[in-house]
Amino acid sequence: MACRKFCGVYRRPDKRQEASVPPETNTAPAFPASTFYTPAEDAYLAPGPPETIHPSRPPSPGEAARLCQLQEILAQMHSDEDYPIVDAAGAEEEDEADDDAPDDVAYPEDYAEGRFLSMVSAAPLPGASGHPPVPGRAAPPDVRTCDTGKVGATGFTPEELDTMDREALRAISRGCKPPSTLAKLVTGLGFAIHGALIPGSEGCVFDSSHPNYPHRVIVKAGWYASTSHEARLLRRLNHPAILPLLDLHVVSGVTCLVLPKYHCDLYTYLSKRPSPLGHLQITAVSRQLLSAIDYVHCKGIIHRDIKTENIFINTPENICLGDFGAACFVRGCRSSPFHYGIAGTIDTNAPEVLAGDPYTQVIDIWSAGLVIFETAVHTASLFSAPRDPERRPCDNQIARIIRQAQVHVDEFPTHAESRLTAHYRSRAAGNNRPAWTRPAWTRYYKIHTDVEYLICKALTFDAALRPSAAELLRLPLFHPK
């Protein structure tokens, strides 16, 4: 059955006159072998495919590249070479004078200890990624079979450990602790490290076990205030679809979060699948994600970095939202936009964030729409940037969204102070797709009717008309007859 028309999907000039939801007309899963399909004749289609409608996923780096990447991440994370203030008792104190960020917004702070400048810890760091290999990606070499020397208890030879610490010396001088030191701190807490995941922007993540926990756990060791901020947020949350905080340890300026271990993240899970998820599975993932977002928003929190890499999964019926390091608390009225600043990932950021406009909690709805799209298609990422770095990534990302969705000039925000409208509305002047109709990208993918409708609602270009998670959960997709 051809997909329904989407005229009037987004138009909501008055909250009291919301566009009615079309009735559910197709409840059977529809995923043919071909990714592309021909929609109904009465549905308007923009001419020609977008340039980067389904970019390929980047390959996984090998172990040598992982170490190089680690050096670059650590070296770039700190630009301030000042050391922290130390009180009479030897404890580190935060320098409040230079802190102009709000206390409840995740932001980096400088933690540095001079004794790490010349220290090369003997505690080895496990080198293999905790994720299973992904088809189409080069598997990292197994460092446990390395012939360069005797392998340590957790997976690295002394030679590899020395190389890793030498590469991290510059980062250490700027206040970051080397991964070997983080591993030593974690093992000092009684954890046995079984593997290390690719480090993120905040620190290192270890696959660990402990006598106090019957199952494997994840220890996230971070040196930035955002890790402590994440712990403070997680303590306030209690929802089955949100990653729970099992325990918290702070040692030597490093915050260690103890979290339950899931099978993998949603990105890896989808990358490994040879075929898309079924309709019921997509619905289950979407329902859990939107339920978690609705709960977080009711707590006055904006996640700001919802993406497949930050969603953890055992089965499609058992997922959870994690990584609250970029989250912030709502300032003032929840429906009033505020300048919280840019955060998260450019590929999944909402247009108003990319443009530098004030925003509300509905930026998470945009990101959730992209996650649901990837869950339904599984071989493509909508609006994804090319692999090569761009000089003006935010500007280019907005241009990609306008081009690939064929955004109409009437679909831009109407308030006069919108930078998105003032700076980018002219770029949509050549788009001849009628306003409030199906976005141009829908012509390229075979997605179940009700799932496509959910995605289109979540990807409403004007944030003022974008629905909340609670509104999306009332769609017919989640209430089949």
UniProtKB/Swiss-Prot annotation:
Residues 191-478 form the Protein kinase domain. It comes from the Viruses. It is an enzyme of class 2 (transferase). Residues 47-61 have a biased composition (Pro residues). It is found in: Host cytoplasm; Host nucleus. Phosphorylated by UL13; this phosphorylation regulates subsequent phosphorylation of UL31 and UL34 by US3. Autophosphorylated. The active site is at D305. Signal peptide: none annotated. Its EC number is 2.7.11.1. It holds the Pfam family Pkinase. Residues 12-63 are annotated as: Disordered. Keywords: ATP-binding, Host cytoplasm, Host nucleus, Host-virus interaction, Kinase, Modulation of host cell apoptosis by virus, Modulation of host chromatin by virus, Nucleotide-binding, Serine/threonine-protein kinase, Transferase. It catalyses: L-seryl-[protein] + ATP = O-phospho-L-seryl-[protein] + ADP + H(+); L-threonyl-[protein] + ATP = O-phospho-L-threonyl-[protein] + ADP + H(+). InterPro entries: Kinase-like_dom_sf, NEK_Ser/Thr_kinase, Prot_kinase_dom, Ser/Thr_kinase_AS. Disulfide bonds: none annotated. GO terms for biological process: symbiont-mediated perturbation of host apoptosis; symbiont-mediated perturbation of host chromatin organization. One of its GO terms (molecular function) is protein serine/threonine kinase activity. Belongs to the protein kinase superfamily. Ser/Thr protein kinase family. PANTHER family: KINASE, PUTATIVE-RELATED, SERINE/THREONINE-PROTEIN KINASE NEK. Interacts with host LAT; this interaction prevents LAT activation of TRAF6. Multifunctional serine/threonine kinase that plays a role in several processes including egress of virus particles from the nucleus, modulation of the actin cytoskeleton and inhibition of host immune response. Phosphorylates UL31 and UL34, two critical regulators of capsid budding from nucleus to endoplasmic reticulum, thereby facilitating virion egress. Modulates and redistributes host components of the nuclear envelope, including LMNA, emerin/EMD and the nuclear matrix protein MATR3. In turn, facilitates nuclear pore impairment and capsid release through impaired nuclear envelope. This is Serine/threonine-protein kinase US3.
